[in-house]
Amino acid sequence: MVRFLEYMIQNISVELLRAVTGDGYPIISTRNEISTVPDLLQGRHEEFVLSPRIDTEMVAEACRAGCIPMAHKIGDFEFLMIKLHHFRSVLQFPDLHTPRKTRSRSRGLRIAVDRDFSRCLGAVRDHYPPSMRWLTPRLCTVLDELHGQPRSGVSTHSIEVYDGAGLVAGEIGYRIGAVYTSMSGFYLRSGSGTVQLVSLARILESSGFLFWDLGMDVAYKRTLGAKLFPRAQFLALYYRGTALSAGFPPGDLSCEELIRGSEVNR
């Protein structure tokens, strides 16, 4: 009886999602279907598969599959948007380029991982107007849960840049094996976002990560040295990296020293 009720609720949710979004996107409702996302998107212009489920199981499985979990809210209805890019932005650390003035702007700033995940997540969410927020309340709850209790090797993290006690830049993302994926970030001071990015690249490189998954192609990522990988090529690299092991260092580090090291080694 319980399974029948779950089946009925699941089907009602799928039909509701279809009614809200139309027939333009594939829709799935179970964890096992996430492995079919590349096939569902094959030959399509769209980069999203939708699901009425936003929970740790679905989000973690989407991450493991090389997709980036996003969400959308219409009224009180939230749904998962599982994104698999046609081309993924990837930074391989020998390609890192430090833009001019980054080091001078880094003076006095320190970077920490997971010092205050909730604060950083809230700052990232609030950096964007409500109409542009894909970090919905339910997705934020799930990301917080995965931070406190990783699932299937997926752990969420906050990258935070401080000037004293003030949080001036940061981002949220997730780690699987030796791959870190950026989800979204913010900055409150000119240049602090670039300081955060270059400092994080140095941390990832020195901590044994294979590469940095930067998600969507944006000009500033190419300026840092990121390159675009077609979907199939990216997934092959991603699965290789997630089978390896790496982790973040404890405590906080000087952004200026990290960036100086980047300049010396290149």
Sequence positions of predicted segments:
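N-acyltransferase acceptor-side catalytic subdomain
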Residues: 1-266
